[in-house]
Amino acid sequence: MEPIEQQLTELRTTLRHHEYLYHVMDAPEIPDAEYDRLMRELRELEAQRPDLITPDSPTQRVGAAPLTAFNQIRHEVPMLSLDNVFDEESFLAFNKRVQDRLKSTENVIWCCELKLDGLAVSILYENGVLVSAATRGDGTTGEDITSNVRTIRAIPLKLHGDNIPARLEVRGEVFLPQAGFEKINEDARRTGGKVFANPRNAAAGSLRQLDPRITAKRPLTFFCYGVGILEGGELPDTHLGRLLQFKAWGLPVSDRVTLCDSPQAVLDFYRNVEKDRPTLGFDIDGVVIKVNSLALQEQLGFVARAPRWAVAFKFPAQEQMTFVRDVEFQVGRTGAITPVARLEPVQVAGVLVSNATLHNADEIERLGLRIGDKVVIRRAGDVIPQVVNVVLSERPEETRPIVFPTHCPVCGSDVERVEGEAVTRCTGGLICGAQRKESLKHFVSRRAMDVDGMGDKIIDQLVEREYVHTPADLFRLTAGKLTGLDRMGPKSAQNVVNALEKAKATTFARFLYALGIREVGEATAAGLAAYFGTLEALQAATIDELQKVPDVGIVVATHVFNFFAEESNRDVIGQLLAEGVHWPAPVVINVQEIDSPFAGKTVVLTGSLSQMSRDDAKARLVALGAKVAGSVSKKTDLVIAGEAAGSKLAKAQELGINVIDEAEMIRLLGA
């Protein structure tokens, strides 16, 4: 090794050591000036020998070029959300559910943490080196923020210590301390820049900067709280043990993590944290309570998109009184019509509130609300303002009733409210302007029609300029019209036109999924396509006939039936076919003639597959006579469980359904 290589290695090791002491142990040994001197020395040596610069060098936190947009990263292990409780009674009920499910009379050991009010992120280390980072996004897919996360000094670019797994995905919260937030806003007011409403918004805005040099100037920090991918190594078998191991490897962990051996101890922890909340120096909105034992976590499993072994115990929201001046009705991307109260502006939890959600017609009836009423406003979870109750004793004489619309306030289509649901929805579907942008984005997405290069910003411009009203209009676009869009040159425009032409050749299942019918995901679309075979047969199906499809119940059947009953939707489908959208003729599969262990079986896939994509697995299973369903029920014959299988696996085990792993599936596919 050359002398300069030895110097570089020693300097990097020394700087990483002091970063660990400062950010993780909160026990710096040297003054900032000495740290800066060491960093300057390292930069000077690397300038002499740029060929010796390594990606994990402390000098390489900032250096990536500004991005034009964030790429998407699909989470190999989904980032689930947590269920919430808001009072002691609800927590005690949660504790009892856990004990009942474990069939135990002994107290559960809980690991309690602060619920940080920041941005959830996933950070992947390979052989101890940070290789990628992503936002939570929708839990399945997030944005690639690797360059920005590298600028956060609390996050090590390289882990130190022994027995570091080959692949380790650390999950945690990026947040902004109160002092840093105040400094950012102070600078913004002085320079005429953007002033943030709260530290969470500032943290999110800082982390989503396209230019990492801007992120580097923001005093963001990080605490880790969990793990996603774990390959080529082992971790302790308790949650606290894992956090302590992370800390030993150089990752920051909150010093308020506490083990509680009884429900009362958890409540004491909650009250103490609530009391200390104003002095923490950063925002939290509750505490997170997790079963400490990993074995018990696995036994408890998951439900929907949340674990059964953890809960967020939120702090009470702050409340104020004000008057409802009007009620307007907004239409969301799925057609949900939401009443919104326009309020006399009032400060709630440090934020000026002028609007509050009323959720739905049932909520208005429950509140007994009228326009002009004096109401109590709460910022639920410290974020979303809502009306808690009407102050009936101070009701003015001039109040008037709230009339829920019978037609969509945007497109005029009829509204529907399915039995058993609280939400009223517009039936306009593909022609409703309020739903148009999101419907089109879904239509062109990778798992739907898969139009390469047709990003969200292009869709936004096409709708705003009224170039596109329905999905069929996309296939009428010309390169000349696209060239007029922002950042769209002739070559890019022609590429999009070519991609649209290519997308016309699809499958019946993809086409159904692309239509965006409520509750019809990929698995349901595939089931409908396989059962009915043709669009004509599906359009003519009754609600009873639709329910014969595996995994389709009354709710889904009603949504499908109503979608095809709407004349405007049928018109758009006709236009799409006229523009050349097509798919192969159905292949009739006689299950009795197929010699396969999957023939005639209803199969559910869960977890991540490593040997093939989920789409490929579905296609091969269907080709061998299987019916692939999206959820586990008593009708399910077989569950194929990949890595990080969750609630579907747990339900299959409860019902005694046969479960195999990916390796066994591949063996049977070749049988």
From Swiss-Prot:
Cofactor requirements of the protein: Mg(2+); Mn(2+)
Family annotation (PROSITE patterns): BRCT, DNA_LIGASE_N1, DNA_LIGASE_N2
Any GO molecular function: DNA ligase (NAD+) activity
Assigned GO CC terms: cytosol
Binding site for Zn(2+): C408, C411, C426, C432
Gene3D superfamilies xrefs: 5' to 3' exonuclease, C-terminal subdomain (1.10.150.20), 6.20.10.30, BRCT domain (3.40.50.10190), DNA ligase/mRNA capping enzyme (3.30.470.30), Helix hairpin bin (1.10.287.610), Nucleic acid-binding proteins (2.40.50.140)
EC number annotated for this UniProt entry: 6.5.1.2
GO BP terms in the entry: DNA repair; DNA replication
Binding site for NAD(+): D32, A33, E34, Y35, D36, S81, L82, E113, R136, E173, K290, K314
Ranges of residues in domain BRCT: 593-671
Catalytic site positions: K115 (n6-amp-lysine intermediate)
InterPro entries, sorted: BRCT_dom, BRCT_dom_sf, DisA/LigA_HHH, DNA_ligase, DNA_ligase_AS, DNA_ligase_CS, DNAligase_adenylation, DNAligase_N
Enzyme class name: ligase
Key words of the record: DNA damage, DNA repair, DNA replication, Ligase, Magnesium, Manganese, Metal-binding, NAD, Zinc
Entry keyword annotation includes Zinc: yes
Catalytic activity: NAD(+) + (deoxyribonucleotide)n-3'-hydroxyl + 5'-phospho-(deoxyribonucleotide)m = (deoxyribonucleotide)n+m + AMP + beta-nicotinamide D-nucleotide
Recorded family membership: Belongs to the NAD-dependent DNA ligase family. LigA subfamily.
Function: DNA ligase that catalyzes the formation of phosphodiester linkages between 5'-phosphoryl and 3'-hydroxyl groups in double-stranded DNA using NAD as a coenzyme and as the energy source for the reaction. It is essential for DNA replication and repair of damaged DNA.
HAMAP family with a match to the protein in the record: DNA_ligase_A (MF_01588)
NCBIfam families referenced in this protein's UniProt entry, alphabetically: dnlj (TIGR00575), PRK07956.1 (NF005932)
Protein name: DNA ligase
Organism: Salmonella newport (strain SL254)
Chain's gene name: ligA
